[in-house]
Design a protein with these regions (language model features):
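Hydrophobic/aromatic beta-strand elements that line small-molecule binding cavities or substrate pockets
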Residues: 36-38, 215
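A low-complexity, Ser/Thr/Gly/Pro-enriched, surface-exposed linker/loop concept
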Residues: 39-86, 122-127
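A generic structural motif
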Residues: 33, 43-45, 100, 223
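Catalytic and substrate-binding clefts that recognize carbohydrates or anionic sugar/phosphate headgroups
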Residues: 80-285
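Boundary at the C-terminal end of the N-terminal hydrophobic targeting segment
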Residues: 19-22
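Carbohydrate-binding surfaces of carbohydrate-active enzymes
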Residues: 28, 32
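Sec-dependent N-terminal signal peptides
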Residues: 4-13
Length: 287
C-alpha cells in the first residue's frame, strides 16, 4: 500500500509540469487552481500566461500575426521540487511558486532582478480598491467596451462601459515588486504627465485627444521590461497606489505578458521590437 502511495505522489509531481522540448513551453498546474504557461522565447525573453480556465485565450496580436511566434530553440533547464519550479536559460532563472504562481527572476550570478511577479484574481481586494481609483480618475472617458477591436467577440460594440474598469468580477491584476530608486519609461502616447512614470497611473486605451497611441510596454532602469499582450483596456499603476508595487490592471480575468531582460536598456528595447516587429526605414528621398 505504501508503494502505491509513493508512486501516486511521484506521478503527481511529474505531471504538474509538462515541457514541450522543441517549443520550450512549460504548462504548470498551480495548487491554487490557476493554470500557468511559460514559453522560453530567447535567453532573455519569456512569455507567461495565467488563467483560471482550462484553456488559454488566443491573443488577437497572435491571431493576426502581429507578434513573433517562430522563436528558435535555446538551451533550457528545468527543476521541479515540492515548493517551486525553476526554469533557467544561459542568462536568467525564473523561480515559480507552485502554490501561488509567484515568480522571481534573477541572473545566473544570483542577482535578483525582480523579487516578485504574481497574478491576482478578482477575489483579491486590490482589484476593487484600485478599480475605484481608476474609475474616479477616468470617469469622464467611458467608451464602448472594446467596440472597435475586430475579432473580439466577447464584447460587441453595443455594450457600454458602466465604469472604466468594467465589472470588478471580470478583472485581474499583475502585481510586480519594485526596487527603491527604480525608474520606468515607455507606454507610448498615453495619459502621462512625465517621461519617467514611477508614481503615475497610465490608461492603455486609445481615445481621441486623450490617449492617442498607448503602448502597454514599460522598461525599467534595472534593465528589464514588460509587454502586456492584450487588446483589451488596461491600466499601468507604477507605484502610484502602492509605492513599491507596479500593478497592471487588466479588464479580463487572465494575463498574457512578456518579460524581457538585457545588460542595458537598449538591449531590452531590442527584445521588445523582436516581439512586436521593427518598422522599416524609408529611403532618403521619402524624407
Amino acid at each position: 500500500m505504501k508503494k502505491i502511495y509513493y508512486l501516486l505522489v511521484c506521478l503527481f509531481f511529474l505531471q504538474s509540469v509538462f515541457a514541450a522540448g522543441e517549443k520550450q513551453i512549460f504548462d504548470i498546474r498551480l495548487q491554487n487552481g490557476l493554470n500557468m504557461n511559460v514559453e522560453v522565447c530567447t535567453d532573455g525573453i519569456f512569455r507567461i500566461r495565467v488563467t483560471p480556465h482550462s484553456t488559454f485565450s488566443e491573443s488577437l496580436m497572435q491571431r493576426y500575426g502581429i507578434i513573433k511566434t517562430d522563436w528558435s530553440p535555446v538551451p533550457v533547464s528545468q527543476k521541479d521540487n515540492k515548493q517551486q519550479i525553476e526554469v533557467s536559460t544561459g542568462a536568467y532563472r525564473l523561480k515559480i511558486d507552485k502554490k501561488t504562481g509567484a515568480i522571481s527572476v534573477s541572473d545566473r550570478k544570483g542577482r535578483v532582478i525582480i523579487e516578485k511577479v504574481i497574478f491576482l484574481t478578482s477575489a483579491d481586494p486590490l482589484c476593487t480598491d484600485l478599480g475605484e481609483v481608476i474609475n474616479a480618475k477616468y470617469k469622464d472617458m467611458k467608451v464602448p467596451n472594446n467596440g472597435t477591436i475586430i475579432g473580439d467577440d466577447k464584447n460587441p460594440g453595443s455594450m457600454k462601459d458602466q465604469a472604466e474598469t468594467g465589472d470588478y468580477k471580470n478583472v485581474s491584476i499583475l502585481s510586480i515588486s519594485l526596487k527603491d530608486g527604480e525608474r520606468f519609461y515607455g507606454g507610448g502616447s498615453t495619459s502621462r504627465d512625465h517621461i519617467q512614470h514611477r508614481g503615475e497611473l497610465l490608461r492603455m486605451w486609445t481615445t481621441y485627444q486623450h490617449t492617442e497611441i498607448p503602448m502597454p510596454f514599460m522598461i525599467s532602469s534595472e534593465n528589464w521590461g514588460i509587454f502586456n499582450n492584450t487588446t483589451r483596456k488596461n491600466f499601468f499603476d507604477i507605484g502610484s497606489y502602492q509605492p513599491d508595487v507596479f500593478s497592471i490592471y487588466n479588464t479580463t480575468d487572465e494575463a498574457d505578458f512578456y518579460l524581457m531582460f538585457g545588460s542595458s536598456m537598449p538591449d531590452v528595447i531590442n527584445d521588445y521590437t523582436a516581439i512586436t516587429g521593427r518598422t522599416y526605414l524609408l529611403p532618403k528621398y521619402a524624407y
